[in-house]
A protein has these predicted regions:
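Rossmann-fold NAD(P) dinucleotide-binding segment
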Residues: 53-65, 80
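N-terminal glycine-/charge-rich "phosphate-binding" loop or analogous flexible N-terminal tail
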Residues: 1-44
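Rossmann-fold NAD(P)-binding glycine/threonine-rich loop
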Residues: 76-86
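A short, aliphatic-rich alpha-helical micro-motif
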Residues: 40-41, 59-62, 144
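Phosphate-binding beta-alpha-beta segment of Rossmann-like dinucleotide-binding domains, i.e.
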Residues: 86, 94-148
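Short beta->alpha connector loops at strand-helix junctions that form conserved
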Residues: 30, 71-72, 88-99
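Rossmann-like dinucleotide/phosphate-binding beta-alpha-beta segment
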Residues: 19, 135-165
Length: 165
């Protein structure tokens, strides 16, 4: 059976890991410091991580490692060039958060465009009630109609943002 090590289980919250645990000799750690990585992975054939860094020197010191599963979309925590050089397969979970991230992007963009945080503070802080003015001109009030905006990057998330917009 494959020796599987999950270095940062905390990152998945209360997700049920029982299907993964059935695939081999499984050991999971809530968190793993950079000083603990090598010791915890020394016999692993499969390493699962989310944020834990797996740099060149670490990968070179793990002769049994065959596969790294990144429990995230980003892959910048693993030295991909060295992994490829060593024949270690690496896979992320591309696409799992595309809709959520695109929706959050639109939410934040609209909030910035409409000065939501500023006006929220202005009203809740009592400034509006304390003034005799009907209108407040401290920040611009913009309309979406007729506005144009651009999307920087047309990967899966960028395309979804453009589609939703």
């Amino acid at each position: 059976m494959a020796k599987i090590v999950f270095l940062d289980e905390y990152s998945l919250g209360d997700m049920d890991l029982s299907p993964i645990k059935k695939l081999g000799e499984y050991v999971g750690y809530d968190r793993t410091s950079k000083e603990q990585v090598l010791e915890r992975c020394k016999e692993a054939e499969i390493v699962i991580c989310n944020k834990t860094l797996l740099r060149a020197e670490t990968l070179r010191a793990l002769p049994n490692l065959r596969f790294i599963a990144i429990a995230a979309t980003g892959m910048n925590n693993v030295d991909l060039e060295v992994a490829a050089e060593l024949g270690i397969g690496v896979k992320n979970v591309a696409g799992y958060s595309t809709s959520s991230v695109a929706e959050a992007t639109l939410t934040f963009a609209l909030s910035l465009f409409k000065n939501t945080a500023y006006f929220d503070h202005y009203f809740k802080g009592g400034a509006y009630a304390a003034t005799e003015d009907i209108f407040h001109f401290g920040r611009p009030v913009r309309q979406l109609r007729g506005s144009k905006w651009g999307v920087v990057g047309m990967g899966s998330i960028g395309r979804e943002v453009a589609r939703l917009a």
